[in-house]
């Protein structure tokens, strides 16, 4: 879901998250007494893996309205903030990757047509990447555990490799009664996030959206934080009115050819 991960906002939340992580590490599958839990975990990973594959490979091009707030924070105080509204387009390119672009329509409540302005931070990639922690080809890179209403994940220790690229990442997904993800959060150790240009914390709230007759689970709310020296860039975005994106092609009338006199009959 974009580059990012979990950054607790209070000591109480940090304590709760640490407790959940302790449960995650203690509940590894393997012992015979945990076989039913292990089976349920594998079923859940299969479900989430299918959702991740859909987003990465079959999610069609689409467009949404993005309403966002970009802030520069220091010691919890806002140093700078910019609000904007934009038309977001996520288009699948010839290489199969989903590329996001935006056309900004208003800045701080005023219409915007052209020119330049400074955003403290901008975050993208929260649609096709938010479920990548459950992609089938990468599940061997993580340690998972299942708890009521959630699944925890933690990247296995060790340096990044071409297959496992998320060292220092830990997070969880909240699940509905059917086992579908409704929220994904994760954090990345700051020392590892910086060279990878990842958010140290990111959270996506997810809801089903129908595109081209198929239901996809897409982010409708995103919050992320990026380190910037002694300051932090905070990015909040809401996505609405998402629909299938189709390019418009205008065909101009053909240039009429000069009339050629018909040859006389022989």
List the model feature ranges, each with a label:
Residues 3, 30-33:
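Amphipathic/hydrophobic helical signal segments and adjacent flexible N-terminal regions
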Residues 173:
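Aspartyl protease active-site motif detector
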Residues 1-13:
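N-terminal secretory signal peptides that target proteins for export/translocation
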